[in-house]
Amino acid sequence: NPDRMWEFSAKHKVEILGISPTLIRVLSTMGDDLPKKHDLSSLRAFASTGEPWNPAPWYWLFEKVGNSKLPIINYSGGTEISGGILMGNPLLPQKAGSFSAPCPGIDADILGEDGASLPAGEVGELAIRKPWIGMARGFWEENERYLETYWSRFEKIWVHGDFAMKDAD
């Protein structure tokens, strides 16, 4: 039932709706009528994680469902770091598919092949330069695999395995 999420959100007066970009890609193809027929006035924000956005579904959610008022809090992290690396900040202007800043306490950076910070507009490895609260010390009974996976690319720098790019703004 493509209407189920909107029904549930209205019935239970959901305030923060967690979604994935793929879900919104699919729902946006079904038109604007499904969300519009429900009272979604309890919604205060959308939370999104798990994959990158492309502009069309982001704008559909922001404009058609959120009435150009509700922030889409984009979040990148992972279970292996016990939280987030980058996040959207609802107090800052929204930009389709982007993050506003690193999560508090995270020294995130985007690195080139040589491990140096990249300027805006260049794609590189998403990394964390300093220890953080909740930082894992290894995998269960596989510490060597943990070190090889996240710590072997650059000295004393944790590498997430995702690519990222800073915007000029």
Short names for language-model regions:
Residues N1-F8:
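ATP-dependent adenylate-forming carboxylate-activation enzymes
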Residues A101-G105, W158:
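Short coil-to-beta-strand transition motifs
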